[in-house]
Swiss-Prot record:
This is Glutamyl-tRNA reductase. Pathway: Porphyrin-containing compound metabolism; protoporphyrin-IX biosynthesis; 5-aminolevulinate from L-glutamyl-tRNA(Glu): step 1/2. It comes from Acinetobacter baylyi (strain ATCC 33305 / BD413 / ADP1). The lineage of its organism: Bacteria, Pseudomonadati, Pseudomonadota, Gammaproteobacteria, Moraxellales. The active site is at 50 (nucleophile). Possesses an unusual extended V-shaped dimeric structure with each monomer consisting of three distinct domains arranged along a curved 'spinal' alpha-helix. The N-terminal catalytic domain specifically recognizes the glutamate moiety of the substrate. The second domain is the NADPH-binding domain, and the third C-terminal domain is responsible for dimerization. Signal peptide: none annotated. CDD domains: NAD_bind_Glutamyl_tRNA_reduct. Keywords: NADP, Oxidoreductase, Porphyrin biosynthesis.
Length: 431
């Protein structure tokens, strides 16, 4: 039984193909329930996000993973063949750890993927398609991800506009829980900014947008995390003083936040500082506001330079993280081999005990029949030795024929050491 990882991601497949093989949680739960009694594919976890769909499974038949992925999505296998990647055992473990740590993500070091992998495991557990061995691999991958994030800087620098704005707010204001944020426009960029700020724990988000419908759509996305208020675009200047942080991205050809408006807002705020972030091109905010005391103005170029520098730092940290993942994967595989050896040793011990019991019973029967005790004892020892040596002798001969010479020489040395140790005379002084 081997551990396999098979799938497609943003590096190997177009968005169109990724859409074809994607699963939502409800459909995936039904499919996993169907796999529960499958002879060769009943121990599996499926990770499906916008950037990847991957199947992780314990199985003896790797091709069945590709067949399953194609058939469940109605895709010709030939269409998938040129885009899927497949890893086995050590490589599969390393890949899973890299995925969980954010090292294989489109946005290097992004933290969301760990939660998505955890959710995938939880769904498979609910469907009873996760063995103890498969669960152990995933739990160790989560441990690796935690180590990577806590011991390297791979996730500590902002590399998206939304995240950068949130981090900037933390630098300017020490306590995000007291902040009121104003989103001027409710487009895609400001939606990302609003989500990051809401997750950071700001007190309130004011959405200022021309279309109330679009503002309400954004409000619904963050209302479970933060208090939300919607105002019309004509109310922007009158409410500017209420905002500690303003993020503007309108797409307008003209400025929408003027010097005099910000100056008046500062006065109403008793000159408490304001952070203004202009994500628009052309710019939304009059650049002269930067001359006002207490105003921090950042534009797209300012943020992009920070993001570029941070991404370079993440890439540097990723080198250290890759080494850590490789070491942790090796530790897990070593642990698994030791466990497998322990199971084999236990089986061999039980086999030996059974052979001993059989021969003892036979010897006692012979003694009860009046056979010579010395002959019975010699026959007992001979038969037991033959039974114990037969399977190991066969394995040693096969190893000599098929295993690498180095491995066979190592095994001979180990056995020789054991035999020499057993031949040493006992110290009778301790009796």
């Amino acid at each position: 039984m081997s551990f396999f990882a098979l799938g497609v991601n943003h590096q190997t497949a177009s968005v169109e193909l990724r859409e074809q093989v994607a699963f939502n949680a409800e459909r995936l739960k039904d499919l996993l329930a169907q796999q529960r009694n499958h002879a060769h594919l009943n121990d599996m976890v499926v990770v499906s996000t916008c950037n990847r769909t991957e199947v992780y499974a314990m199985t003896e038949h790797a091709d069945i993973l590709l067949n399953w992925l194609a058939q469940t999505n109605g895709i010709d296998i030939k269409q998938l063949l040129h885009h899927v990647y497949r890893y086995e055992d050590a490589q599969a473990v390393t890949h899973l750890m890299r995925v969980a740590s954010g090292l294989d993500s489109l946005m290097l070091g992004e933290p969301q993927i760990l939660g998505q992998v955890k959710s995938a495991l939880a769904l498979s557990k609910e469907s009873h398609t996760v063995s103890r061995d498969l669960n152990r691999i995933f739990e160790y991958a989560f441990y690796a991800a935690k180590r990577v994030r806590s011991e390297t800087a791979v996730g500590s620098h902002a590399v998206s506009m939304g995240y950068a704005v949130a981090q900037l707010a933390l630098q300017v204001f020490s306590n995000p829980e007291k902040l009121t944020v104003m989103m001027v426009a409710a487009g895609e960029m400001n939606t990302l900014v609003a989500k990051h700020l809401a997750e950071m724990g700001v007190a309130k988000v004011i959405i200022c947008n021309r279309s109330r419908e679009r503002a309400e759509s954004l409000a619904q996305e963050i209302a479970h995390q933060v208090e939300v208020e919607i105002i019309g675009f004509d109310q922007l200047a009158a409410n500017l003083h209420r905002a500690d942080v303003v993020s503007s991205c309108t797409g307008s050809l003209h400025q929408v936040i003027f010097y005099q408006d910000v100056k008046a807002a500062l006065k109403k705020r008793r000159y408490n500082q304001m952070l203004l972030v202009d994500l628009a091109v052309p710019r939304d905010i009059d650049s002269k506001v930067e001359t006002l005391d207490g105003v921090y103005l950042y534009g797209v170029d300012d943020l992009q330079s920070v993001i570029d520098e941070n991404l370079a730092q993440r890439r540097q940290a990723a080198v250290e993280a890759e080494v850590m993942v490789s070491q942790l994967a090796s530790q897990l595989l070593t642990h698994q081999k030791i466990q497998q050896a322990g199971s084999t040793i236990q089986m061999y011990r039980e086999f030996s005990q059974q052979q001993s019991q059989d021969e003892i019973a036979r010897a006692l029967t012979d003694l009860n029949k009046g056979h010579d005790a010395e002959d019975v004892l010699k026959q007992f020892a001979h038969r037991l030795t033959q039974k114990m040596m037969h399977p190991t002798s066969i394995l040693l001969r096969e190893a000599a024929q098929h295993e690498s010479p180095d491995y066979f020489e190592w095994m001979k040395e180990q056995l020789t050491d054991v035999f020499e140790h057993q031949r040493k005379p006992k110290n009778n002084l301790d009796r």
